[in-house]
UniProtKB/Swiss-Prot annotation:
The keyword RNA-binding does not apply. Belongs to the CSN8 family. The keyword Transcription does not apply. Component of the COP9 signalosome (CSN) complex. This is COP9 signalosome complex subunit 8. It is found in: Cytoplasm; Nucleus. Coiled coil: none annotated. The gene is csnH.
Length: 212
């Protein structure tokens, strides 16, 4: 089956179809050759190429292909790589590489992104929070409220009781005497077991009420 031509409408259809991260990556990978040819033959398609490469970049992050994302930034046509959104992608990649959580949330939430990529920006923020939650749960025996909030992009200055409630609702324990949270370890479920994903989705629904 022939691949439909790359266009803004086709790109939107791929992004909004709600595929898994792997499906999204595979679908966008198939268009990289078309994008490369467009950049060489039709400079007027700059907006399309910017949207495509931004979406393709996020498909790498959503599948945790950080090294491959770095390689992608080196393949992007020079005239596109110089655009603001591509520079922002590079900033985000550097922050992810260096595990600078506060900077990651700031870039995702405060810097401008191409319109069609907004769903992927939000999707990656949720993915990064889920991933960070698992890492915290399995790396810390105890953690202070402010640190836990910062890792998940919550406002450490928010009402302490609200933050505590969000974590205890996820199975964490609160030691009021020592002012410490005790994370609940997350056991990685088998691929066909949706229990871990369901728990993470519940967690993200809880913390999303905190806002940015």
């Amino acid at each position: 089956m022939d691949l439909p031509p790359l266009s803004l409408d086709q790109l939107s259809a791929v992004i909004t179809a709600g595929p898994t991260p792997t499906d999204l990556y595979t679908s966008l990978s198939a268009y990289e050759e078309q994008a490369c040819l467009l950049s060489a033959t039709d400079p007027s398609e700059k907006d399309l190429l910017l949207e495509f490469y931004t979406a393709f970049f996020f498909s790498h992050l959503l599948t945790d292909q950080i090294c491959e994302a770095r390689a992608l930034t080196r393949r992007i046509p020079r005239e596109i790589s110089r655009l603001d959104a591509m520079q922002t992608c590079s900033l985000l990649l550097r922050a992810v590489w260096q595990s600078k959580h506060t900077e990651i949330y700031k870039i995702l939430r405060e810097l401008p992104w191409p319109g069609r990529s907004q769903p992927l920006v939000q999707r990656y923020e949720s993915y990064f929070q889920e991933k960070t939650l698992v890492e915290m749960s399995n790396s810390y025996e105890t953690i202070r409220i402010a640190a836990a909030a910062t890792y998940l992009g919550l406002d450490p200055a928010a009402v302490e009781g609200d933050i505590i409630e969000k974590f205890t609702a996820c199975g964490w324990k609160w030691d009021s005497e020592k002012q410490l949270l005790h994370p609940k370890p997350v056991v990685t479920a088998p691929p066909k077991d949706d229990s871990l994903q369901n728990e993470l989705s519940r967690v993200m629904a809880l913390i999303s009420n905190q806002g940015s």
